[in-house]
Curated annotation (Swiss-Prot):
GO cellular component: plasma membrane
InterPro entries named in the record: Csa (IPR007595), Csa_sf (IPR038641)
Signal peptide interval: 1-22
Membrane topology reported for the UniProt record: Lipid-anchor
Organism: Staphylococcus aureus (strain N315)
Pfam families: DUF576
Name of the protein described by the UniProt record: Uncharacterized lipoprotein SA0403
Source organism, top-level taxon: Bacteria
Keyword Cell division recorded: no
TM ranges: none
Lineage of producing organism: Bacteria, Bacillati, Bacillota, Bacilli, Bacillales
UniProtKB keywords: Cell membrane, Lipoprotein, Membrane, Palmitate, Signal
Subcellular locations according to the entry: Cell membrane
Length: 266
């Protein structure tokens, strides 16, 4: 009789265990989050930096931490690289672009870079490239090289990066994007139509000579892991171009990378 009770008890325990395990599996399945679409993943990847816009005082970046991985050496606080340029087709059938890149080292709390003027010709002539060294102190761009052209000097000293006045916190509201993926690199691209009523578009029209009423296209490009990578690269472009043979766009990027480099890597 005692043996029979033990057998019955064993069967009851087994049935209850199977029931509990089945419930847990069902719960795990129901609670498993649905993977975001690639469009949403691209937006979220950009949002990690774009949510900081506008960065009115660039020196705030000295206290901003970015994505860190194994590429960073011990003790390296990293470096922010901010970049903006305005590109347009020129009369020679080529491309002219002008802008600035600034490297903000969080270790030394110093910012150095250069303003560039580039002219690319359609054919038969090498491109012209001129760089003018700059540094930033007290959130002010200081020109280090001598510049004879008064208008160019003013453009350099009064330059503002797109990230200083842009507001892309509502990026998630852009929808129906055209997404393309190259898994081999990997790289990701997304395009969204913008409106001329967008405050970011209005800001660009007030700062640059944009001789078209065409509403622009917002283009996002990522090289590397969508979750983040110090060796990856993100670029944002607002394209006002009228057609394939016409270039008119503003390119912006803000990336966080290691500041300290081994001598063997240089």
């Amino acid at each position: 009789m005692g043996y029979f009770k033990r057998v019955v008890l064993y069967i009851i325990v087994m049935v209850v265990s199977v029931f509990i395990i089945g419930c847990n599996k069902s719960s795990d399945t129901s609670e498993k989050p649905k993977e975001d679409s690639k469009e949403t993943q691209i937006k979220k990847s950009f949002a990690k930096t774009l949510d900081m816009y506008p960065i009115k005082n660039l020196e705030d970046l000295y206290d901003k931490e970015g994505y860190r991985d194994g590429e960073f050496k011990k003790g390296d606080k990293g470096m922010w690289t901010i970049y903006t340029d305005f590109a347009k087709s020129n009369k020679q059938g080529g491309l002219s672009n002008e802008g600035m890149v600034l490297y903000l080292d969080r270790n030394t709390r110093t910012a150095k870079g250069h303003y560039f003027v580039k002219t690319f010709y359609n054919k038969g002539k090498f491109p012209d490239r001129k760089n003018y060294k700059v540094e930033m102190k007290n959130n002010k761009i200081i020109l280090l090289d001598k510049v004879e052209d008064i208008n160019l000097k003013k453009r350099i000293e009064n330059f503002k990066f797109f990230g200083q006045y842009a507001n892309l916190k509502e990026l998630k509201n852009y929808s129906n994007g055209d997404v393309s993926i190259n898994e081999n690199v990997p790289s990701y691209d997304a395009k969204f139509k913008m409106s001329n009523k967008d405050e970011n578009v209005k800001q660009l029209r007030s700062r640059y000579n944009i001789p078209t009423d065409k509403a622009p296209v917002l283009k996002m490009h990522i090289d590397g892991d969508l979750k983040g990578s110090s060796v990856g690269y993100k670029k944002l472009e607002i394209d006002f171009s009228k057609g394939e043979k016409s270039d008119l766009s503003v390119i912006d990027s803000l990336n966080f990378q290691p500041a300290k480099v081994d001598e063997d890597d240089e």
